[in-house]
Amino acid sequence: MVAGPNGSGKTTLMRRLADDYAVNFYDVLNADDIYAEVRRTGAYAPRMSLLDGILRSYAETTSYPEEVKSFFRDGSITLESDLIRFAPDAVNSYTVALVASFLQSMHILQKSSFSQESVFSHVSKVDALREARNNGFRTYLYFVATESAVINAARVENRTALGGHSVPPEKIASRFPLSVANAAAALPHLSRAYFFDNSSETMRFFAEWDEENGLMSSDEANGGFPKWFAPIADAAKKIPVSGGRFDVQPNPALSAPAAVASHDAIARAFAAGLQVTVMRGGKIVRVSPDGTETEVKGDLS
């Protein structure tokens, strides 16, 4: 699971981990990518073999509203010959989310490895990790966030200007604490977790969770944990483990792709003439391509 609030840098981090660190993410279930493919082609091709008709049966078991399930019931969304087809009026974020949930369940049922990219603001994502763990999977979480939803909102604004999807600032702000809380709640269901802070110009890998050793980091003793990490650190200390140490240094092999990921994003923004929003000296600032700095006042609360 690659997770974190909207605009934290999940997609860029995931790409760099795969390219530079050779992380195998297997079949990546990303609702945004599924939505884009369905909008473009009217269909989505799962990377697994599935029985015709099983999607409709699955939809009926979910808690989605009837108006969403009706698209599966009336044949507007069908699974035939390993292709999920959507009628034009059936394409929306809710139907796509249900399909992503279905594919997740099928992977767990078939015991085939997969990954998800998620804002992690809904408890169902914690439930998915619990279910996978209970079915014999090793579960990994890569979680990235920033010190302020203001930074995230500004980066989503840049993403939108570059052709990506938008998210309202108030939704980013409301989801932010939920994402962090769910990361804390997920710890007992994880084999391992890696935590990244993307507040400044350089994304930083600063802590690791291991089911045997607990929270491993050199940053706590140095006062270096980002503020957003406090609920996760508190939860980690309450979970009994066999070891536990704070003398390890951040893994250079993970630190390098994280740094490159953030630098890539900044380079894309500057190339398009956009400002970037980062933490500098404890302040949130907007930096122009020419290096001009402007402090950002206020918050999204």
Feature annotation, model-predicted:
Residues 5-6:
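The conserved Walker
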Residues 11:
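Walker A/P-loop
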Residues 14-15:
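The feature captures the helix immediately C-terminal to the Walker
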Residues 18-109:
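Conserved substrate/cofactor phosphate-moiety recognition/catalytic segment
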Residues 134-182:
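A glycine- and Lys/Arg-enriched "phosphate-lid" helix/loop adjacent to the NTP-binding pocket
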Residues 187-240:
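NTP-dependent small-molecule kinase module
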Residues 254-293:
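Amphipathic, hydrophobic secondary-structure cores in small proteins
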